[in-house]
């Protein structure tokens, strides 16, 4: 028998042909959840994780409620410039996951596929396309994306810009991690600033941009300390909180809320007890809604989710407020998702060593060619260093592409192997 969330999702699906109604229904559901998060937060969550749930929900509601100030962007687009212009970023992964949380993702994915979008495209992008092409997202001010890390970016954001008749900005990031690439991207970000001035009919407030970059710098420094502090600690973590943190480490960088979260997270981790459990690194998207994943990893002292590599993609990046464009460019160029898969492999090894990881789950997201293409290379490299890797197929947002039975069987076998390995060392 369908529960209240499933019924709500069906209401939204039934209203897609009336996009204003569908948007109002989503906003009603999201705002109700926002009130619950504020007045009755989940008690098992640490203070930082409770705060993350609140600010992520707020960041999802704002562009949906005010599309005239919204920008459709990809997850890696530097958003300090948007914050300086008081614009509201909306990105594919967040849109899709919140639709999933409302049990409404399938209707929008089906809408996109019915409009000619390939079924093999990343489900996150199909959900955003369905929201946009149906009119449910409202008409944003513009679209903007980078070439990192997904070839769906060009299709998704260009198609939406053409559909709405709005400007589109594309930031092509060079493959190499060097000073020439940083200089090139810095110039393109200055062009993006001019693009924003044209779109908003406002001049860039350079002091506001410097302040945003300063927030980013302090946030990244605190997050780096938090990642290091995880070593040997028994963390009270859950899979959904790792998704919320993706907001902080990407589109919310440059905001005081992101800095506040990072400060709270460091305090929570430093207050955590030492020792215990099998320690896991998760690579790529986390299917937070899947029961087999939640049941085995949420708040588990035995099987602990320590880190998702998407929340460690820019560790060690220094942000200089006096050189905002160069700082944003360096963060983008040196992102582990830019260029060779070796960058991502090396970051995973750094995290494994630093955080005393026992095993790695490498999630092959439906439609993500980069992640699936690097899977065997990743597995071979980490296992050569003594870190077992589970390659797990699935979908981080579309229930139709998930197989709970297979996920449960493979996770159980992997965790049992890690437990046996630990017992043999005792």
Residue ranges and their predicted role:
Residues 125-225:
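Internal, well-ordered alpha/beta segment that forms a basic, Gly-enriched binding/recognition surface
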Residues 50-121, 125-137:
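An N-terminal, globular interaction/scaffold subdomain
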């Amino acid at each position: 028998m369908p529960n209240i969330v499933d019924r709500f999702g069906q209401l939204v699906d039934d209203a897609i042909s009336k996009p204003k109604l569908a948007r109002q229904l989503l906003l009603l559901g999201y705002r109700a959840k926002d009130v619950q998060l504020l007045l009755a937060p989940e008690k098992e969550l640490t203070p930082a994780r409770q705060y993350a749930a609140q600010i992520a929900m707020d960041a999802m509601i704002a562009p949906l409620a005010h599309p005239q100030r919204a920008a459709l962007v990809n997850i890696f687009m530097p958003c300090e410039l948007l914050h300086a212009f008081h614009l509201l970023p909306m990105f594919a992964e967040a849109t899709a996951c919140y639709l999933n949380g409302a049990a409404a993702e399938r209707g929008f994915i089906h809408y996109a596929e019915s409009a000619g979008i390939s079924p093999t495209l990343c489900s996150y992008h199909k959900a955003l396309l369905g929201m946009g092409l149906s009119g449910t997202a409202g008409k944003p001010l513009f679209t903007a994306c980078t070439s990192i890390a997904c070839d769906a970016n060009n299709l998704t954001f260009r198609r939406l810009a053409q559909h709405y008749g709005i400007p589109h900005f594309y930031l092509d990031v060079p493959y190499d991690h060097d000073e020439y690439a940083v200089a090139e991207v810095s110039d393109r970000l200055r062009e993006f600033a001019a693009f924003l001035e044209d779109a908003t009919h406002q001049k860039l407030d350079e002091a506001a941009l410097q302040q945003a970059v300063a927030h980013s710098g302090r946030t990244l420094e605190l997050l780096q300390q938090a990642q290091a502090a995880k070593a040997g600690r028994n963390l009270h973590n859950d899979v959904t909180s790792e998704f919320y943190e993706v907001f902080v480490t990407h589109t919310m960088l440059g905001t005081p809320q992101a800095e506040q979260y990072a400060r709270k997270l460091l305090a929570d981790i430093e207050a955590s007890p030492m020792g215990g459990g099998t320690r896991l690194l998760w690579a790529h998207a986390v299917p937070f809604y899947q029961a087999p994943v939640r049941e085995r990893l949420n708040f588990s002292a035995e099987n602990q989710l320590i880190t998702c590599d998407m929340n460690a993609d820019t560790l060690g990046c220094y942000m200089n407020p006096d050189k905002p464009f160069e700082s944003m460019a360096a963060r983008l160029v040196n992102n582990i998702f830019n260029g060779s898969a070796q960058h991502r492999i090396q970051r995973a090894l750094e995290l494994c060593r630093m955080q005393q990881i026992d095993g790695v789950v490498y999630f092959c997201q439906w439609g993500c060619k980069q992640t699936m293409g690097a899977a065997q290379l990743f597995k071979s490299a980490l296992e050569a260093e003594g870190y077992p890797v589970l390659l797990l197929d699935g979908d981080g947002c579309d229930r139709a592409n998930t197989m709970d039975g297979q996920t449960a069987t493979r996770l159980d076998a992997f965790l049992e192997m890690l437990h046996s390995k630990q017992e043999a060392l005792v």
